Amino acid sequence: MISELFQTMHKARFSGIRIVPENSPSLQQSCVRAFVESVRQTKTQGDSEERLMQLQFLPAPLLTPILDRMCRYPELRDMLRDELTDPVLFMKLFNGYAPDYDTLEKCLREAARAGGRPAVLRDLANNYCDMLRTELRSALRKGETHGQQPRIRARVLESLRFGDYLYEAGWCRCGAEVLTLTQELIVLLLPHASRALQMECLVRLLRAQIGACMNARAAATVQRLLAFVVEIPAVGESGATTLLPLVKAYLQLGCYYYHVQDYDRCHQWALRALASAADGDAPAKGDVIDVLQLIALFCIAKERHDLGNMLISQAVQRARTEYGSLHRKYADVLQQYGFVLLRMNAILPAITAFTECLDITGRVYGLLSPHAVVLEGYLAHCLYLRSHTTGRFDMALRHAETALELASQLMPTSRRVRQQLEHTRDLILRGPDNRRDTKESQPSRERDFHSFTLHEIKEKFFELDSSFERDGLACSG
């Protein structure tokens, strides 16, 4: 039925004949509304599942409005969730000619509200990994992949984007699993076509593993990535392509060493990333923002608070200008800004930053996401510290309980997250720590800094970098 409706719609559209008022619903809108209404009416009769199977044969421009319409009806959330966890259907939307991520994320937010099953992206990632494993087994069983190179390459590019999307949505472990299988797919490509993809996959995989605290796997990925970085000069001299994400590689190596608290190596790779960074197109500007965050974290770890505050403030300003104030990447920078303020004992500004970040991530991913768990935990800790001044611990306890409840729903097997949140809750229940200094710092606010060019930032940092070396020599002497 639905295919005939859409064929009629296209014939009417191309005929150029309009027999309805200008402001009336289009034929496509009428078809979508009629289809979703019929699904609602037949849901209790047991044949609605058969009707929705036809969605797999529709292109993305027609799928999107149908799923968007389904979001209006709470009784269809379970059905919407089942459709979105189907990797074939989801990838049709994800890879659309002009992906409408706003609508897609709206559908994911609604599907997460289906009774007791909020982890939509986790289940989707598991189904997608099963699909990749099936394709890998099929390719290896046939033994001949030469004729399948275009299809394999398309799947690799899709998996790279999807793994990155899972990481950005807070599902770091799921993203790491997808990217691990992507590596196995890349091996099936011809060597000359796979080198750049191998390095790009390693960079993204390392980022996801760091986010998921998969330290042992991240250490192995670092060794493979270092081998690529060392070989690149020789590749360039031989005339081969050098279009490899060097800045991103330096950046993730620096992030790894910061994560394992090897600050000397973090400093080394941060310097190389900053020296290689350049303002240009949107990806290059994103690299600069990431480099500024890494160097700011390094400065805070070395207790250079003024420099760290200046650098993270530059990252916040650039992210707001580049992405806008309601973008997921701006929220990521804002979260790091809150963390830097917390490390500087600037509790009240940190609470403001984390609260704004929670509002943005709630608008993008909903409040049933791993981001909400982390941010609620940060807010609980900040409000606990703030409570030593105000004497009120109820707000801190409320955020801690919310974080624990979300963690039990979204990541019930993550003992590390639960232990950290339970520790925060225990501190709150224990009451004030009389040994704690309640005096808070008041650093310069982000908006107090004027925007520096990348050249000015490099000059300031490299000028001050010599002081790091002098301090290191003094300590060693």
Give names to the regions the model predicted:
Residues 183-190, 224-236, 272-279, 313-321, ...:
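Amphipathic alpha-helical segments of tetratricopeptide repeats
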